[in-house]
Amino acid sequence: MSGTNSWLNNNNNNSNTTLTNTNTIGGTNFGINQFDGDDWDNIFDGNNGDGDGDLDGDSYKSYQNPYSYRDCIIFLIDASKAMFEPNENNEIPFHNAVKCLIQTITDKIITSDSDLIGVCFYNTNKKKNINDFENIYVLSDLDIPDPKIILTLEEMLENSNFTTNGLGNCQGEMPFCDALWTCSTMFSNIKQSGSSSGENSNNNNFKRIFLFTNEDNPNAYNDSIRNSSIQRSKDLSDLNIQIELFSMNKSVNDKFDFSLFYQHILIFADEENYLDPTQFDASSKFSDLRFKLKRKEFKKRSLGKLPLYIGNLNNNNNNSNSLDSQVIISTQLYNLFSHAHKSSPTLLDPKTNLPVKQLIKNVCANTQATLLPSQIKLCYHYGGEPVIFTKDEMQTIKSIDRIGFTLLGFKPLENIKPYHSIKHSQFIFPDDQSIKGSVLAFNALVEQMLKSGKAAICRFTPRSSSSPRMVALIPQEEILQSESEFNNQQLLNSLSSQQQQQQSSQQSSSSQQQQQQQQQQQQQQQQQQQQQLPSSSQQSNNNRKIQIRPRGMHVIYLPFADDIRYPNNIGVKSDGLEIKQENIDKAKNIIKMMKIKFDEKKFVNPGLQKHYASLQAIALERDKVEETVDNIQPDRKLIEKVIDTTQDFSDGIFPVGYASTVSSATSSTSSSSAKRLRDGKDLSTMDWPDMVKSGEIIKLTVDDLKSFLSNQNIKPSSKAKKADLIDLISNLISGGNFKPDKLHLLKKDSPPLSDNTITTNGGDDDDNNRPSKKVKSTSTSTTASKNTSSSSPPLVSAATMNKKAPPKKSFSVKDKNSSNNSSGGSSKANVNDEFDIDFKNSDQDDDTDNESDVNNKATTSTTTITTTTAAPKKNNFVNNGMFDTRELCKYGKNCYRTNKQHLDEYRHQ
């Protein structure tokens, strides 16, 4: 079984199957864990090899890893009558909210299977909640998302009327504070089954309420209920429960007004959420609402909290003088990009289909007693004696440097080149909660680095067990923009995108009337959107700033000295074609026409999407898998638009017939060059001592060097590299052990064509020591009046074979002697799919058979093989267009030899 150590948490955790792994630990009576030399190297590996593990250490024990927190989200959806009225886009707001809920549940199942999601409707006709409030229906408590919820929500969308689901809309107006109270109760009743920490599990969660509504002023005429709702929102904020508003417009003329009620309900825990530009935007389309939800769906979690040491470089933190002489700034490390992987499988019990819980027990090999973690020690044998280590000592040995960033100095920003980044960068942000004053000190450092144009060079150790890396900290200034300017820019961007779409549609349309209509529509849309732009007086009243880019530092991982390679300069001859400026301008025009607006969010991994679509179809018990769109494929429409321009450029660069002349000349040159190399290299006639002295031996291939050593009765190691083989040859010649009289046994790279005799051994000197293998053959006994001997078939040219042998047709090659002398007997040889003649020898046939033995026999055994042939393959023809007639290895496809010399001399199918 395969899986991970993180199991699904569900309600039936008590009935989960327990998978127990028993480790038998051998050793003396004190029960230590003994390592070999290989295992000793493994103990220095970190606890987590993914690079995102626990960042705690001795010097920073107070830091916690936020990745251990779970995300708990309650979808609080308004079910009033106004939510079921179609908007200007003919979309129902309630349906848009439910669709967003389905998408979020699907994403959570794929990416975060331990997060909790709850669903609550308010302003309903029925009630279902713990507090027994009217007009509140809890569809699902906070729990791990289940595919059954998706089926229930999809059934709700299929029904045109909400009342068919048994809920309906309430007649009057319910107190909004009761909905907030219900959410608070749902958070307090989170099931503890999936928690490993027990009582504190409810505190280590991100708690959020996603509120979907188009009513901007609930309980407008009841100040008491409004005050209760505001107080309830403050109580939720004190419990670290955050409310995220997803507002929707009722119509074009009835926009959602945030200032009427919800500006008192939303309490921002930090400045980051307050500066979010999507917090106050109302959506009318499902795509806009989904995009807004995507930004809020996943909580921004840091990889960990790390200190930035400035000052004394001494790692001894116990020295009070060293602590006083340095400044420590608390920072949080974030991943800006990460590679998307398929989720790991989870072990399940085949009987109950519940997650398997893994338990590991360490058992002493001598006493068979279960060992506690405190009874297990580590050791390494040195001088015949075990050297014992405790866990604390092992942690000290594995800790090379203190955790965090240690400032070494500064370098100009222009010295940090783009190719210095060897992996995706990370981002650090100050954290004032761990060490007060970190934000002030960090901002001062960033400001001075920006003024001086410097980058900080630091030694970075993410974990106590990891090796330190050299990194460069690149400062980034904060960018703020007023809300009015941001909204204007968004409208102008949407206007420009619509203009581009209309221009492209105009180019594709053929009639002039359609173009004029589209131009009129374009002018009307421009006038409408210009009217939607706020006036100067409205802009002056709205001075709220929106953060476009935060202040911080990018962590650039620097390479080591041997990681940088400089390519050799390649000399370019200037006697080629002269390119005119006109053709250069054409090439520039092609590049401009092929440019697209790149948005990384539009390009997803098609393999992952297909994988998740298959899982979703299985979980929801659907017959068909939803088709996924592959946006990585080339844009065929864009390519078709530039075909004429590309052809014009090609005609201007290449003369008529240039491409065909080059291709034919190249093929003829390459074939002639290959023939010269193949026929000209004769290892038996080479002056090996002179080649070693002049250094020309380095031009030979590894197979040539091995052939020479094998000729001199020297067997090199199978892992020997080319330099090792050259050293062996140099030592052989300089030591006087060179035997030139054996060079005549060396063969050329292209061996001569085989004779009539078929050799059954593989040309291996150790063939007698190999286990013999019987080859099955289909034999037919025929009577021969005269001598019958096996001979190789005549060579047939490739061109003739293409004409005479159509695909998928059997034919036989008859022996000259047997066709002339034998009576009714014929020797048939098969030509397989690659035009190789396959001889399957019977067990009694061997190379030692001579003509006298054959003449004395009245009957002879001939092998008949009948298979179909396919079209000849180009790579199987050698030597002036002749098909392959190399000798067949007696082991055929089951041959165990891997040396290249044997593979070149014999065929195996």
UniProtKB/Swiss-Prot annotation:
Enzyme class: hydrolase
Compartment(s): Nucleus
GO cellular component, one term: Ku70:Ku80 complex
Catalytic activity line of the entry: ATP + H2O = ADP + phosphate + H(+)
GO biological process, one term: double-strand break repair via nonhomologous end joining
Entry keyword set: ATP-binding, DNA damage, DNA recombination, DNA repair, DNA-binding, Helicase, Hydrolase, Nucleotide-binding, Nucleus
Low complexity bias (residue ranges): 494-543, 663-674, 777-800, 818-832
EC number per UniProt: 3.6.4.12
Pfam families reported in the protein's UniProt record: Ku, Ku_C, Ku_N, zf-CCHH
Function, in words: Involved in non-homologous end joining (NHEJ) DNA double strand break repair.
Binding partners and assembly: Heterodimer of ku70 and ku80.
Name recorded for this polypeptide: ATP-dependent DNA helicase ku70
Lineage of the organism: Eukaryota, Amoebozoa, Evosea, Eumycetozoa, Dictyostelia
